[in-house]
UniProtKB/Swiss-Prot annotation:
Single Gene Ontology MF annotation: arginine decarboxylase activity
Protein's UniProt keywords contain Lyase: yes
Protein name: Pyruvoyl-dependent arginine decarboxylase 1
Chain positions with Pyruvic acid (Ser) modification: S45
EC number: 4.1.1.19
Cystines in this chain: none
Cofactor(s) the record lists: pyruvate
Organism listed in the record: Methanosarcina mazei (strain ATCC BAA-159 / DSM 3647 / Goe1 / Go1 / JCM 11833 / OCM 88)
NCBIfam families listed in its UniProt record: PRK12398.1 (NF009064), pyruvoyl-dependent arginine decarboxylase (TIGR00286)
Primary enzyme class: lyase
Amino acid sequence: MITKLIPKKVFFTSGAGTHPEKLESFEAALRDACIEKFNLVTVSSILPPRCEIVTKEEGLKELSPGEIVFCVMSRISSNDPGKTLTSSVGCALPVDISKHGYISEYHAYEESAQDAGAHAVKLAESMYSTWTKEEPLKTFSIPRSSTVKDSGDWMTVISAAVFVI
């Protein structure tokens, strides 16, 4: 028997990390977002029907270290001193919970968290509206911004929608 992997819950998080090594700056960002303990698999932009949005704390309680966890993630890295890095995920909730919504990912250099969040919402809203021909019930974003330190160490910024099966 094949089990369908349809998430029942989702939580949103973000993080930023810095380190002389690019990979370790990503690890630091995952730690800041509290999702470093999982084997993350990035997926595309669908919020499943009837998927409950929970707090990060609630979602983390249902996951185990080493678990394969699906997520929609925006990620950006640089070691260019003074450069501002911004990531965001946006969400468009369906009017009818029996239908799916959309999650977008967006990242940019030299853009404010507010602007990146607005752009991520615009993307999610557009994907939803062009499919349903209606406005979503609600939209929101989880933006994060940070600036590369003068030391030239790597900075990574992430935003993620993390699914719980």
